[in-house]
Amino acid sequence: MEQEVNRGLPSTFLTFHSSSFVELLKEYDPTLLPAKRAAETFGEAPHGTTIVAATFAGGVLLAGDRRTTMGNLIAGRDVDKLTITDDYSAVGFAGTVGISIDMTRLFVVELEHYEKIEGVPLSLEGKSNRLAAIVKGNLPMANAGMVSIPLFIGYDLEASDPARAGRIVSFDAIGARYEEKSGYQSIGSGSPFAKSSLKKLHDPGSDDAATLSALIEALYDAADDDSATGGPDMVRRIFPTAIRITAEGAYRYTEEELAAVADAVVARRSADEPGVRSFTAS
């Protein structure tokens, strides 16, 4: 009976003992890994930027623009670069789009595989470590210019203070991970401008609505100075995407919600004198 059930399955699936799906692929068929697949189609490819994240009282938010570029051309205007990876985490990628999509899908399966094998979900630190390993596995393609950098957010269920349980983890191209203590971070070509904006706008004690507005405004500022970043497109009604993580789980904002926030940001900025930001003391 056992032979009949196992008929057709490669021996690797029956003898491999690991909770890591990435390690299983390395053993079974390394060509299925993102770096190997990308090598087959190496050449000029679309790149995506910019991703921003910020904590608030009780959670953390992730937002991303919708533009992808290929050289000096706009390759896409409505690309979603954010993914909910499980109930309490999400990831956004900047860099080569094809590799980013493969790495994100692999990370989602990695988390699901671990939970099925071990019977419990990975800790937040464990999730970021697994993502770091996936990024490190793409090092050969990164050296060839096909870089993909993630920005990871999550809610720490083991945090002593639920109001400060939101976490942001960034990575470099070789897989090193850094937990952001400042409460905000940005990656991609527009990140210097987005971070400068968040440095003034971010308030870790604010609610999710105020933080979402700050993130959309940061993307607006990035798009103002970085041609590879797409801000709110008021003509085509294309707006940034955003994900919220709290103790209740992950939530993806609807197009209607994001449109309302973007409209308010653009209206507020349009009311200012051109080229000058006005700040009012509270």
Swiss-Prot record:
It comes from the Bacteria. One of its GO terms (molecular function) is threonine-type endopeptidase activity. Residues 1-48 form a propeptide. The keyword Hydrolase applies. It holds the Pfam family Proteasome. SUPFAM superfamilies: N-terminal nucleophile aminohydrolases (Ntn hydrolases) (SSF56235). Its EC number is 3.4.25.1. The active site is at 49 (nucleophile). It is found in: Cytoplasm. One of its GO terms (cellular component) is proteasome core complex, beta-subunit complex. It catalyses: Cleavage of peptide bonds with very broad specificity. The formation of the proteasomal ATPase ARC-20S proteasome complex, likely via the docking of the C-termini of ARC into the intersubunit pockets in the alpha-rings, may trigger opening of the gate for substrate entry. Interconversion between the open-gate and close-gate conformations leads to a dynamic regulation of the 20S proteasome proteolysis activity. PROSITE patterns: PROTEASOME_BETA_2. Gene3D superfamilies: Glutamine Phosphoribosylpyrophosphate, subunit 1, domain 1. Its main location: cytoplasm. The keyword Protease applies. GO terms for biological process: modification-dependent protein catabolic process; proteasomal protein catabolic process. Pathway: Protein degradation; proteasomal Pup-dependent pathway. Keywords: Autocatalytic cleavage, Cytoplasm, Hydrolase, Protease, Proteasome, Threonine protease, Zymogen. Belongs to the peptidase T1B family. The 20S proteasome core is composed of 14 alpha and 14 beta subunits that assemble into four stacked heptameric rings, resulting in a barrel-shaped structure. The two inner rings, each composed of seven catalytic beta subunits, are sandwiched by two outer rings, each composed of seven alpha subunits. The catalytic chamber with the active sites is on the inside of the barrel. Has a gated structure, the ends of the cylinder being occluded by the N-termini of the alpha-subunits. Is capped by the proteasome-associated ATPase, ARC. Component of the proteasome core, a large protease complex with broad specificity involved in protein degradation. This is Proteasome subunit beta 1.
